[in-house]
């Protein structure tokens, strides 16, 4: 195998033309303009960073360059992110999270706290799990899922658009589990040999470490760095719905009739309907983690067109299985977050090849 890892400061000579173009672009981007024109634009770009020219800035952060080679939109100086050109269903989920707690705070909390005996612990637990749910929602949908850097393994070729044939092969490595090798594939978009369990997300246009799935409802991938937050979001949303429903039931019983507590009845109906989707999804992921599988691996292993109704079982050749259901759950649910490989809030160095978008290569090497 001809594997050649290239550091950002020392790219291969075959891409010298692209490097010159990028360097000249960086030089033009660093030209200073009058401060009276630049401060407002810098503030706006700090608040929202999208894939657009930034010629008014004298220094860049990595997240500003990352927006050019991925589909990410960054907020608050690279602290939060989402994916561009999607349906933005996460906004709907956010409204569905905030609306019931606002109604509960305005119409229910005061009455329960003052007039219903024994309701105070229920109110406290309701707010606690809602806060946990909201924090998990932000941590899952607006943080780094485990984005891998680009252009780490570039081929030694004289043609800019071709790769050697072995780069299209699958490498098998031994594992502790018999007859279950670890498979590695090369990503022709990101130009890297992907680590085990990593996969390229077409929506985010990035390779994600320990890729589970891309969640349309959260508008982000679920990977190694936010998997625990995703599971916490599912369980806390179920628990917050249970306690909200309990509080409203106490209010309704104390009021005596639905007409005396219409908001309580509305919230009870809302919780009774909305609790099922996160509950079923939480149970589904419990079974997946118990068998040491990600959603991506499970869907690839299922032969049926209806994977929802397919029985979740231990895969025949899983190099990551431990033999214990509890240990499998612990390893996936409590796995280390890992490193931020791109250091998105650090200063951007001109010519850093992790932030290049190279052409898609041809299928065969030059002969």
UniProtKB/Swiss-Prot annotation:
UniProt-annotated catalytic positions: 215 (s-palmitoyl cysteine intermediate)
Lumenal topological domain residue ranges: 109-121, 251-262
Sequence ranges assigned to domain DHHC in this UniProt record: 185-235
Region ranges (Disordered): 1-32
A Pfam family the protein falls into: DHHC
Any GO molecular function: protein-cysteine S-palmitoyltransferase activity
EC assignment: 2.3.1.225
Transmembrane segments: 88-108, 122-142, 230-250, 263-283
Keywords: Acyltransferase, Endoplasmic reticulum, Lipoprotein, Membrane, Palmitate, Transferase, Transmembrane, Transmembrane helix
Protein's job: The ERF2-ERF4 complex is a palmitoyltransferase specific for Ras proteins.
Protein name: Palmitoyltransferase ERF2
Biological source species: Eremothecium gossypii (strain ATCC 10895 / CBS 109.51 / FGSC 9923 / NRRL Y-1056)
Gene: ERF2
């Amino acid at each position: 195998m001809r594997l050649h890892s290239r550091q950002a400061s020392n790219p291969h000579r075959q891409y010298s033309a692209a490097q010159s173009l990028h360097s000249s672009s960086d030089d033009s981007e660093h030209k200073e303009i009058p401060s009276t024109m630049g401060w407002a634009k810098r503030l706006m770009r700090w608040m929202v960073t999208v894939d657009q020219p930034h010629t008014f800035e004298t220094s860049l952060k990595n997240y500003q360059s990352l927006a050019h080679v991925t589909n990410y939109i960054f907020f608050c100086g690279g602290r939060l992110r989402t994916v561009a050109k999607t349906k933005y269903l996460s906004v709907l989920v956010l409204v569905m999270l905030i609306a019931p707690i606002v109604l509960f705070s305005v119409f229910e909390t005061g009455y329960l706290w003052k007039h219903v005996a024994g309701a105070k612990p229920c109110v406290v637990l309701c707010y606690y799990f809602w806060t946990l749910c909201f924090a998990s929602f932000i941590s899952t949908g607006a943080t780094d899922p485990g984005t891998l850097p680009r252009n780490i393994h570039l081929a030694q070729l004289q043609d800019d658009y071709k790769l050697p044939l072995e780069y299209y092969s699958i490498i098998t490595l031994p594992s502790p589990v018999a007859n279950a090798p670890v498979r590695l594939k090369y990503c022709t978009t990101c130009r890297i040999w992907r680590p085990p369990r990593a996969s390229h997300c077409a929506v985010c246009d990035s390779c994600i470490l320990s890729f589970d799935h891309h969640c349309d409802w959260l508008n982000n991938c679920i990977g190694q760095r936010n998997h625990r937050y995703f599971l916490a979001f599912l369980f806390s949303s179920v628990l917050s719905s249970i306690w909200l429903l309990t509080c409203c039931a106490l209010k309704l019983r104390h009021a005596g009739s639905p007409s005396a507590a219409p908001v309580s009845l509305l919230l009870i109906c809302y919780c009774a309907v909305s609790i099922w989707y996160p509950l079923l999804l939480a149970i589904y992921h419990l079974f997946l983690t118990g068998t040491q599988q990600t959603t991506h691996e499970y869907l690839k292993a299922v032969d049926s067109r209806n994977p929802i109704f397919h029985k979740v079982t231990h895969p025949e050749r899983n190099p990551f299985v431990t033999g214990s259901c509890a240990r499998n759950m612990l390893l996936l649910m409590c796995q280390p977050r890992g490193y931020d490989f791109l250091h998105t809030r650090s200063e951007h160095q001109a010519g850093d090849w992790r932030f290049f978008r190279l052409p898609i290569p041809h299928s065969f090497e030059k002969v």
